[in-house]
């Protein structure tokens, strides 16, 4: 008799299938081998994960604007994360990856080269839901404080002509996924929101309560 086992994890147990005979016939015996892994799985099931802050925002009432998503203390420095919401969640079509990718390249280049905010720019990148972007800046900042910067940034994207920075096989992992025309259109659309930010009946600088 030759015992040949096939391992498959099922929940917290490791199951071994066998026996298998030398002529290729299989028996119907199943045996369970309990391992330390089962205890790990039990602990994982008992661990309750809290809802993260961004999932507590009322996305039904959220409209395009500039919002403070969170502030984190890192050493003696405060990092402010801004929510640059460009479309109405669950109401308008989300942005496609090509135009978001283009906005990311242009915005990151602009911000990193900015005289005042270049050294304070930590990150600019897309939201997974494709309704906007996150901007991380060093400093304890408010939405209104960066409005001039946002107007400057999206005017730059709206008016941009030429080759998108970093749009080459050498510089980017997906350089063909670009759409400058749509990026310019979306930037112009968002710019109108920024320029009349105080004219809306609801705040576009603070999350809906």
For each feature predicted by the language model, list its residue ranges.
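M16/MPP (pitrilysin/insulinase) zinc-metallopeptidase core fold and M16-derived inactive scaffolds
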Residues: 89, 93-145
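His/Glu-rich zincin catalytic helix
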Residues: 42-111
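Active-site-adjacent, His/Asp/Glu-enriched structural segments that form or flank metal-binding
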Residues: 124-196
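Basic polycationic patches enriched in arginine
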Residues: 4, 13, 25-26, 44-46
